[in-house]
Amino acid sequence: MKRINILDECTFNKIAAGEVVERPFSVVKELVENSIDAEAKNITVEVKNGGQDLIKVSDDGAGIYADDIQKAFLTHATSKILNIDDIFSLNTMGFRGEALPSIASISKILLKSKPLSETSGKEIYMEGGNFISFNDVGMNTGTTIKVTDLFYNVPARLKFLKSSSRESSLISDIIQRLSLANPDIAFKLINNGKTVLNTYGSGNLEDAIRVIYGKKTLENISYFESHSDIISVYGYIGNAELSRGSRNNQSIFVNKRYIKSGLITAAVENAFKSFLTINKFPFFVIFIDIFPEYIDVNVHPTKTEIKFKEDKIVFSFVFKTVHESIKKSLYKEFNEQIKEDVKEDNKEIIKENPSLFQNVEKVQIPIDLKSASMDIERKSLVNSVLCNENNIVKDNINKNIYIDTKENLSENKLKNILKENTEDMVSKLPDMKIIGQFDNTYILAESVKNLYIIDQHAAHEKILFETYRDKIKKDEVKSQLLLQPIVLELDSEDFSYYVDNKELFYKTGFNIEVFGENTINIREVPFIMGKPDINNLFMDIINNIKAMGSGETIEVKYDSIAMLACKSAVKAHDKLSKEEMEALINDLRFAKDPFNCPHGRPTIIKITSLELEKKFKRIQ
């Protein structure tokens, strides 16, 4: 056996530098983050040959005291923390005291700095971690660090560098991310003598987004914001036009620290999934402000990964915040005819005109849209109905509040029902007149100089999905007893997933018993599903749960199961009567998210008369 050797400081620092300094952009990131911690308002970064020949970072921050400059190059010397407990209350980017000694050990470095209280600054020069000179220097308040000949003494590292242009691109990317995180700081990036980025430092995030991504991006993003006692989430998400085949345009910041997080990415993408073009990823810039004690930033050498103390709470909060923002944005974009205050107006009309809800004749239901399993409760008021024009309670906003008096509802009960369903009664789409059906697949309708094309299968899928999902959340799912129970023998992994999610199956309408080792007996299934293939349905649910991972909340799992309820929807090429089409569109109008099916495909397309006139060359 070989003898154990104690490494010398030079060798140790070079090895440690391999973790902190992967490539030139790592140097830029560490130095710029130091400038941010110094409360600089202007930061200039200059690079040559992809950072291999030169990296220069200048700032107007607080500066370093003369007697601290040499200390700054000692391993684990830092002004950010005193003990391990301070890591859990960090408000700075750096804290380990590793950056400067690591960089100095593999390059030639010149640092000069002057705090406001001093009349002159100090300049220190080092090569390969060795002190060469330490002198006085005249300069403005702030710090300038010049790194040259990176990796000159570890030539093996040079072989792993990419081309100069690629390394420059990585540097540009990290400066852009830091600019987004700090819109109150003016950043300038100079690459090979040419200024390639220059932000305003106005404090306005939209200004930074415009400089980095352009005017078109700024015009296609929506703001979101939500707060709780321990966490705040805010930022911007792009519409489908900005979606791309990679995640390059996704930025996540936790307490202003740029990180990569599969948890946050999954939360945003799941929220966007119903509106997302298939196989493309949304643009987003998301900020999460959370008490430092709820995160651990000391889990990765480059500090680009963190751990959340309550990851499921964070996932759920981000998911709900982003999803609600997208939903509101789509309503506004798709249907400008629906006013933002329609909900309040509806309440006032109901309050001021109680006589509207008296002596209303029974509304007939001539069809079930081939989904008799849709057991719609009385209090949903409107779903799957066809109303004779004389039986409709009309108001001057949405003309779509219906009441069936068969049960002789008391006035108090009626008020309670109306109160509970005010949101459901607000139409998300305008009133439409049926034109016909194309190819027994698409419903054609018109409204106020707009042509609407509705995918009947996608629309009915969304209606079934929302109905089933709402019933799950309200514990109102009804089950149907199977004439002959189904016995499934599972492998040990699938059986374990079932046991771990037993409550999930119960709440979604399944009655399942353990029937021996790795074997289950399915006695009841959700009534809304009609007559599905039970074996495949159960395995689909198990596979979905497997794919989700531990970060997904129970609500997302409910949504995933609800998608499987859509198989009883009307299909393409099913011929529908005019009454069936009217009922389907009416249900879609009152859906919570009517624009996309559960799988992300659009349910409805709007073509304006202006677009048609352009197509026919009637106007230019």
UniProtKB/Swiss-Prot annotation:
Coiled coil: none
Record lineage: Bacteria, Bacillati, Bacillota, Clostridia, Eubacteriales
Matching Gene3D superfamilies: 3.30.230.10, Histidine kinase-like ATPase, C-terminal domain, MutL, C-terminal domain, dimerisation subdomain, MutL, C-terminal domain, regulatory subdomain
Signal peptide residue numbers: none
Biological process (GO), any one: mismatch repair
Identification of the protein by name: DNA mismatch repair protein MutL
Keyword set, alphabetical order: DNA damage, DNA repair
Record-linked CDD domains: HATPase_MutL-MLH-PMS-like, MutL_Trans
